[in-house]
From Swiss-Prot:
PROSITE patterns: MPN, UPF0758. InterPro entries: MPN, RadC_JAB, RuvA_2-like, UPF0758, UPF0758_CS, UPF0758_N. One of its GO terms (molecular function) is metallopeptidase activity. Residues 99-221 form the MPN domain. It comes from Haemophilus influenzae (strain ATCC 51907 / DSM 11121 / KW20 / Rd). It holds the Pfam family RadC. A motif (JAMM motif) lies at residues 170-183. This is UPF0758 protein HI_0952. Belongs to the UPF0758 family. The keyword Iron-sulfur does not apply. Keywords: Hydrolase, Metal-binding, Metalloprotease, Protease, Zinc. It comes from the Bacteria. Zn(2+) binds at residues 170, 172, 183.
Amino acid sequence: MENNDELMPREKLLAFGAKALSDYELLAIFLRTGIKGCPVMSLSKNVLTHFGPLHALLSADKKAFCSVKGLGITQFIQLQAITEMTKRYLKQDMLSTPIINDPETVKLFLLTELQHEEREVFMVLFLDNQHRLIKKERLFLGTIYVSAVYPREIIKEALYCNAAALILAHNHPSGITEPSYSDQLITKKIQDAAELMEIRVLDHLIVGKSDCYSFAENCLL
């Protein structure tokens, strides 16, 4: 049997699935061809060496993206379309099933929404009594270090859309997902305010560059 490492990316994907591919192999499939003197696999490695992790490539603006040799406006447009389709797929997936049944989908959705933000964004997922998504709202926008959060505004919005439960989320632009004391304090304030209205706070997720910290999973709720 042929060794996995000897297969070209497309063959490897068909044989073992997309999860078996490295970042540069996935990017090579997207790029399709290389440039003169630089085969596609080498070009893919060069691109990732330039940008670093995938999230940096995906969040690059048009100028930064197209400044790299071998990349152009066509690839930029295609990548933006793929990223947006991923966001919409995850949102539709959450709309079709109770969120509590699939916490990993929630994490993936929040990563696609918040991991590239350069300032703190505080988002709330409003859920019905079956824990299905009613809507998502970016309620507060802050600096690179902190965002001002007002529990009364969250509860007001929850009552307006008749939400029975909430999932709180915000990003740390630093990439460090460990909650600060102020994160824990505001979570408790929101939780207390929600309980007065018989609304449950199911979780508070802190989004980094590639992962999420869950208050619920770490027994902080």
